[in-house]
A protein has these predicted regions:
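Conserved alpha/beta-domain cores
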Residues: 1-156
Length: 156
């Protein structure tokens, strides 16, 4: 998903991830019955999910899975590498640039919470948007969260 070449491809990968995240979160809610659960979204830097460029076998395997050549795979990985990832592109900044990732995670949380409630568990999910520096960042993220909330609640 991280290395996808465009929105359509990224959306397809996100649809594959949604049920997996939803199931994981359902299990968390089930096990934490009656306790608050804080889910910290989009926290790790994206490069943590990528193979190291020095590991040619992993890069080649990933490129093959994506249907691209090794050079294209290497280039895509290089574009996501950061000099100091702890200060860079992660948390709310990822959500601002890729609101579709935020929407998928929020949808997974909400669907899992609804499922847990229907199964008789008391759930108290809290969503944390990490690394927020300004009100403006929250203002940019809230429309996606609200839209996703409304979408899930309309079908729940």
């Amino acid at each position: 998903m991280i290395l996808s070449s465009g929105m359509q491809e990224r959306e397809a990968y996100l649809q594959e991830l949604l049920p997996m995240q939803q199931e994981d979160l359902f299990q968390v809610f089930r096990l934490s019955d009656k306790r608050e659960v804080i889910i910290r979204l989009l926290d790790p830097p994206l490069h943590e999910f990528l193979p190291e460029l020095e590991n040619k076998a992993e890069v080649a395997e990933l490129a093959m899975e994506m249907g691209i050549n090794i050079e294209q795979g290497t280039l895509r990985i290089k574009t996501l590498k950061e000099h100091n990832p702890m200060l860079g592109f992660r948390g709310c900044r990822t959500a601002i640039l890729h609101p579709e990732i935020l929407a998928m995670q929020v949808e997974a949380i909400l669907r899992a919470a609804v499922r847990a409630l229907r199964a008789g568990f008391e759930v108290h999910p809290q969503i944390m948007l990490p690394l927020v520096c300004t009100d403006h960042e929250i203002d940019q993220l809230m429309p996606t969260i609200r839209r996703t909330y409304n979408k899930v609640m309309d079908i729940a």
